[in-house]
Amino acid sequence: MADLQKIVDDLSSLTVLEAAELAKLLEEKWGVSAAAAVAVAAPGGGGAAAAPAEEKTEFTVVLASAGDKKIEVIKEVRAITGLGLKEAKDLVEGAPKPVKEGVNKEEAEKIKGQLEKAGAKVELK
């Protein structure tokens, strides 16, 4: 039982990028695909529903790096996320890290613009 708890603790400490890489490695090892379940469910919606499903509606704003103006980026991260100073500083120094998840395209572009104006390098996923 202690071994299972250690596994849970180890998995909980992974970053989003590390978790995605782990998922890819497990898919290869076990010969499965996480996307297969989605592909099986999609045909039931019909051909007309397939086109809108391809357009991504939720985005994750990822801080790739803080750039030269780390203090400005920390201030902007605090304003966007509502995090405290220490949490925002840890997020910025731990880049690449997601700043905001599950936002629409318009909000994601707005956040990206704010962070880039502060000097950060940002990706939308």
From Swiss-Prot:
One of its GO terms (cellular component) is cytosolic large ribosomal subunit. The keyword Hydrolase does not apply. The keyword Nucleus does not apply. Keywords: Ribonucleoprotein, Ribosomal protein. CDD domains: Ribosomal_L7_L12 (cd00387). GO terms for molecular function: mRNA binding; structural constituent of ribosome. Gene3D superfamilies: 3.30.1390.10, Single helix bin. InterPro entries: Ribosomal_bL12, Ribosomal_bL12_C, Ribosomal_bL12_C/ClpS-like, Ribosomal_bL12_oligo, Ribosomal_bL12_oligo_N_sf. One of its GO terms (biological process) is translation. PANTHER family: 39S RIBOSOMAL PROTEIN L12 (PTHR45987), LARGE RIBOSOMAL SUBUNIT PROTEIN BL12M (PTHR45987:SF4). Homodimer. Part of the ribosomal stalk of the 50S ribosomal subunit. Forms a multimeric L10(L12)X complex, where L10 forms an elongated spine to which 2 to 4 L12 dimers bind in a sequential fashion. Binds GTP-bound translation factors. Forms part of the ribosomal stalk which helps the ribosome interact with GTP-bound translation factors. Is thus essential for accurate translation. Belongs to the bacterial ribosomal protein bL12 family. This is Large ribosomal subunit protein bL12. The lineage of its organism: Bacteria, Pseudomonadati, Pseudomonadota, Alphaproteobacteria, Hyphomicrobiales.
